[in-house]
Amino acid sequence: MLSGLTARYTKTSSGYMGQLLEWPEVITEGVDIEDCRQSLEDAAREMVLAYRQQNKEIPVEHSLFETIMVEMA
């Protein structure tokens, strides 16, 4: 079964950092966004396996995210 998780990518001095918003423990880095995305997908798969082995509940998407506009100047 496929489940959607929300990835957040942040530009760093060495490339990109990726994190799953629903599963904050899953954090990766990559030299570019594609590398970071692949690492994040791999890390998520590994975490699913680890959580299943430990009989832990796997986080699922239950949130709504939206952008709000705020005047900054």
Spans of model-derived segments:
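A short, exposed loop/beta-hairpin motif centered on an aromatic-Gly-Thr core
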Residues: 24-35
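Short aromatic-glycine-(Arg/Gly/Cys) micro-motifs in beta-strand/loop hairpins
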Residues: 9-21
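Conserved acidic functional residues
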Residues: 22-24, 55
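Structural detector for hydrophobic anchor residues on beta-strands
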Residues: 5, 16, 26-28
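Short glycine- and Lys/Arg-enriched binding-loop motifs that mark or flank ligand-binding interfaces
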Residues: 11-14, 26, 51
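Short, charged, surface-exposed hinge/linker loops at domain edges
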Residues: 1-6, 38-73
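An amphipathic alpha-helix/helix-turn recognition signal
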Residues: 13, 31, 38-39
